[in-house]
From Swiss-Prot:
It is found in: Cell membrane. Residues 1-21 form the signal peptide. It holds the Pfam family Bmp. Belongs to the BMP lipoprotein family. A lipid is attached at residue 22 (S-archaeol cysteine). CDD domains: PBP1_PrnA-like. This is Uncharacterized lipoprotein PF1695. One of its GO terms (cellular component) is plasma membrane.
Length: 398
């Protein structure tokens, strides 16, 4: 994979709480590492999380010379049997598990196969094992920036309401919710302009029709900007925004997430949040290839380049991927970049970018550190306080 542009500096990784010992011996020189990447039940084609994982693994194939196989369970009930089957085969040096839904299956299986290496992306079992690496993201940090941007866009569209179409009610989405609302309230504090947030869980990452219906409902409730946080489901949300505009019901815009999704409809999707699942997958594979495997937990945030928002280089890169895959219709990658640039200039004003840069710097230098809720009750309490304008409720205490 060619280098992808992101608004952040060079990607670095912060490794936290790692176990000192390595497992599984050393890789024999010349022996090809074999990896299985296990998507969640949504599989490829979500234009987001799973597709980003695929790009990271493909980069590893190209740059590290590994062999990669891709698998998607038919249902959640298939996850444990699939893990056991692959571990018992002793065929794979590493099993990379994509997404929160793999958490419980991995926890049930990992101790039974101590010589099998596992990498869990975007979740943690809460256990520190020598054969398990968990890679997490500080989603609040990117979502806070998106919250500022969405709020500014809403006002340019003549409204004060932003929305989000989310997938399942799970910890990674709690963090997105906290960050997005924090950003909206930060914008409110800096500008004096009130912002209302409509947040809706759909319960699915795979149903575009649900995404469409939910998106339409939020637009009918007055949302001017919708943030997609539901994988394939929020592609339906994109379609709702497109139809809303084309049917003359009003002007609205959408924001993508994980991969750069502007190419899908650049006139209506001027920006996407970045969650570098590709970096996480590549890093896990690289640890095996370079005999640097250590069990534990990694976290990636703004400072490490693991989250953020896509710049125009990234927009171009993913438009090229879409073109190569036959998904980019009636335009070129250059057209996508040109339209996105025009839409950003029109709807994201310089004063909004100033607020974004200020908030980004505070996060990167540690002045702002978000809490990670440890329970649903804590998550709900943080949201309630943020809705009151209490920004400190979302932050770690000194």
């Amino acid at each position: 994979m060619r280098k992808v542009g992101i608004t952040l500096s060079v990607v670095a990784l912060v490794i936290m709480g790692f176990v000192a010992g390595c497992i599984g011996g050393t890789q024999t020189q010349g022996e090809k590492v074999k990896v299985a990447v296990l998507f969640d039940v949504g599989g490829r084609g979500d234009l987001s999380f799973n597709d980003m994982a695929y790009l990271g693994a493909e980069r590893a194939k190209k740059e590290l010379g590994v062999e990669v196989e891709y698998m998607t369970p038919k249902s959640r009930e298939d996850m444990v049997p699939l893990l056991k089957q692959l571990a018992e085969s002793k065929e794979y040096d590493l099993l990379v598990l994509i997404g929160f839904l793999w958490t419980t299956p991995l926890d049930q299986v990992a101790d039974q196969y101590p010589d099998q290496k596992f990498a869990l992306i975007d979740s943690t079992t809460g256990k520190v094992r020598e054969n398990e690496v968990d890679i997490l993201f500080r989603e609040q940090e990117a979502a806070a920036l998106i919250g500022v941007i969405a709020s500014g866009m809403a006002y340019e569209l003549g409204g004060d309401t932003i929305g989000a179409v989310a997938g399942m009610d799970i910890p990674p989405l709690w963090k997105f919710h906290i960050g997005y609302l924090y950003g909206a309230k930060y914008f409110e504090k800096k500008t004096g302009k009130p912002v209302k947030l409509l947040w809706q869980y759909t319960g699915t990452f795979t149903d575009t029709q649900v995404g469409y219906t939910t998106g339409m409902q939020l637009l009918q409730q007055g949302a001017k900007v919708l943030y997609g946080l539901a994988g394939l489901t929020h592609v339906g949300m994109f379609d709702a925004v497109i139809d809303w505009n084309k049917q003359g019901k009003g002007k609205a815009l959408a924001i993508g997430q994980d991969a750069s999704q502007e190419w899908y409809a650049p006139e209506y999707i001027p920006i996407s949040g970045a969650k570098r699942v590709d970096v996480a997958v590549y890093t896990a594979i690289e640890m095996v290839v370079k005999n640097q495997w250590k069990g534990g937990i990694m976290t990636l945030g703004l400072k490490e380049g693991g989250v953020g928002y896509w710049n125009l280089d990234g927009v171009r890169q993913f438009a090229e991927f879409a073109q190569e895959g036959g998904k980019l219709k009636d335009m070129t990658p250059e057209d996508v970049v040109r339209i996105v640039k025009e839409q950003r200039e029109k709807y994201i004003k310089p004063e909004v970018w100033e607020i974004v840069r200020e908030l980004e710097e505070k996060i990167k230098n540690g002045e702002i550190k978000f809490k990670t809720p440890q329970s649903h009750d804590e998550y709900e309490q943080i949201i309630k306080e943020l809705e009151k304008g209490n920004l400190d409720a979302a932050l770690e205490k000194e």
